[in-house]
C-alpha cells in the first residue's frame, strides 16, 4: 500500500531485526541506514505466533501497553489476551476501528 501511495506521509522499511527497529544505536552499529530504524511506531510480525511473543514481551518485560489487531480479513479482528489490561483491550478496539 505504501508503494502504491495509498498511505500518505508514512515511512515503511524492513524487514528489520527488533533491536534495529527500536534502537538507532543498534542500527548504526550494524551499519543499517534507515529513516525508520530506532524510531518505528508500528512493528509488523509475519505470523500470529511471532506477534504473540513480541506482544507479551513488550507488556510483561517492558511494562508497555500494546494493541493487537489481525489484518487481512474483511474487517480488522481485535485479538486480546485474557491477561491484557483494560487499557490494552481498549487500545486494540480503537486501533481496529481506525483501520476499518
Locations of regions flagged by a protein language model:
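Short, ordered loop/turn segments at secondary-structure junctions
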Residues: 17, 48, 82-84
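A C-terminal functional module that forms or caps the active site or interfaces directly
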Residues: 26-73
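C-terminal functional extensions of proteins
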Residues: 54-57, 64-100
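General beta-strand structural signal in soluble alpha/beta enzymes
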Residues: 11-15, 46, 71, 79
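Active-site rim loops that border cofactor/substrate pockets in soluble metabolic enzymes
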Residues: 1-41
Amino acid at each position: 500500500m505504501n508503494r502504491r501511495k495509498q498511505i500518505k506521509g508514512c515511512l515503511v522499511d524492513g524487514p528489520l531485526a527488533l533491536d534495529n527497529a527500536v534502537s538507532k544505536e543498534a542500527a548504526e552499529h550494524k551499519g543499517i541506514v534507515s529513516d525508520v530504524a530506532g524510531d518505528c511506531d508500528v512493528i509488523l510480525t509475519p505470523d500470529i505466533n511471532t506477534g504473540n511473543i513480541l506482544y507479551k514481551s513488550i507488556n510483561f518485560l517492558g511494562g508497555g501497553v500494546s494493541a493487537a489487531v489481525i489484518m487481512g480479513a474483511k474487517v480488522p479482528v481485535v485479538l486480546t489476551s485474557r491477561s491484557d489490561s483494560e487499557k490494552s483491550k481498549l487500545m486494540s478496539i480503537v486501533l481496529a476501528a481506525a483501520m476499518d
